[in-house]
Amino acid sequence: MNPSTSPNRNLASPKSLQLYTTGSEVAWYPTALDEANEIKSINSKAFSFKNQDQIYGAGSLKSRFSTHEISSEKNDSPDFTLVLPSNRLYIVIPGLMLSIFLAALDQTVITTAIPTIVANLDGGSSYSWIGTAYSLAETSILPFCGIMSEVVGRKIVLYTSIVLFLFGSAMCGAAQNMLWLVLCRAVQGIGGGGIMSLVTIVIADITPLQTRPYYTGCMGVTWGVASVMGPLIGGAISQNTTWRWIFFINLPTGGLSLALLIFFLNLVPKPTVSFCVFLRDFDFVGIVTITTGVVLFLLGLNIGSTTGHWAHANVLCYLIFGILCIAGFVVNELYTTRTRIIAPSAFQTLSLSSVMVTSFLHYYIMSTVTYYIPIYFQSIKGDGPLMSGVHTLSLAVVSSVVSAISGMGIGKLKNYRYPMIGGWIVLLAGTGSMIAIYYDTPIPRTMGFLALTAVGIGNLFQPNLIAIQASVPPALMATSCSAFMLLRNMGASVGISIGAVIYDQQLTTLLKGTEYSTGLSYSQIASIPSVSERNFVFNVYANAIRTIWIVNCPVAGVGMLLSFFTKQEKLSQSVTEYKEKDKGFKDAP
């Protein structure tokens, strides 16, 4: 296609154009669009989008983040030719995986070291905020990362996230009191959230759809290995040296990752946006409402699940105002004339909406299993923190291996729909089998049930992400990935909190009228003189956790049904290479 003959060629300057290709030609075309107008096809083999009555000024944010039509017809998907920068993937991918490893490691590494940290810093009851601060900051920053990576550039956001993570790690290691540590864990979480979001986006920028599942599979393995090693590394460090090295150990590894990416990561440059245009077009109301809503909602969930006082005024206020802010964000995104944080068109088809919801449900189930199975082993089977980690290895190892195999299978078969459906079927079977875990169930059998569940969990990591990336045009890739990751993290937080409600409610109900409390440890239960009463209490605690698995079954059933609505898109792209080298911070957004 000749740029001079393209529609609207006189309506926008080069700064408001987006790089696309058709066949072997590369050209800049206007991207300013209006949802109210009918679809205008520029080239049926290249791409289609909606026209706009008013074209905004040069470099307009609105022209950068146009709302592309996402077809609901099977064969009408736009065939975008991907412009790939020249990269040494054998260097860049390990650099990205190192950063992912650190962000994932710090979610679990402190679990076995918390008693040591609390004793050293005299933390008392505030210990729970060591983990909460990280997860809260990580989740709340996700909506911001996608849009800012479009405005200021992928590299700036990615490198800033890594630097923030390393700075937070150094300050956590130097913490002299619990408040210091919690605040710096929040800084770590902001960096970790940026890393998770930007690595996902950058991989989509530098790899074509047909090979991308292999690299997202690497992400799954890296995440799984870090999750497995986290408690073991944390326990080993806290027992053999100072707990501060749990955080200091991030510095050399993170520094290596940052150096590799600065010197070797190349991205295709895009038009810049002036600061005045940014202030004019950026959706400040949207970013404030979604960030405030997520923070308040997660605070309510965390405080409620930690204290068990769900009817307390503070908890209810956090939850209610959080939900209202999120609802306000949705309304704002539907009607705002500014650049949207999350484009509604990312949810406009049943297929995309199904993938987003199943991602939430997937992480809901995964979080309940990974959080409450260690409690089962420690409270019912008498495991210490280290041994409970060993007994949950089947969950982590199997899910990581299956995630890698799933990614390779999707890449080879060019199909993500069947692995997604199969994953939900296996996950439903796994959650159903876990209902058979009682207080006297042999540990090998329990590990077998966990392994079956892990097959379903691991098999769903790659199909969901690939389905999103295959279904949206390049202009919506960053914000769609951020929305996807936000829903995943929200699912995990909701899962842990709902699990806490079920667990506490069941213990309170089943122990009502007895002399036993709801906070007994294994040693306290084991010291009950009467064998019948001892077995009764063990059975009550086991049934409280078992109720969580019972609730997981209909959740998995809903996920399985929704997976059938996912549409299979083509996992192939025409690729042309962008020749110019692009180092360091050179690329524009």
Swiss-Prot record:
One of its GO terms (molecular function) is transmembrane transporter activity. SUPFAM superfamilies: MFS general substrate transporter (SSF103473). PROSITE patterns: MFS. It is found in: Membrane. Signal peptide: none annotated. Its main location: membrane. Keywords: Membrane, Transmembrane, Transmembrane helix, Transport. CDD domains: MFS_Azr1_MDR_like. It is a multi-pass membrane protein. The chain crosses the membrane at residues 90-110, 128-148, 162-182, 189-209, 217-237, 245-265, 284-304, 311-331, 355-375, 390-410, 418-438, 448-468, 483-503, 545-565. Pfam families: MFS_1. GO terms for biological process: basic amino acid transmembrane transport; transmembrane transport. GO terms for cellular component: plasma membrane. Belongs to the major facilitator superfamily. TCR/Tet family. This is Uncharacterized MFS-type transporter C1399.02. It comes from Schizosaccharomyces pombe (strain 972 / ATCC 24843). The lineage of its organism: Eukaryota, Fungi, Dikarya, Ascomycota, Taphrinomycotina.
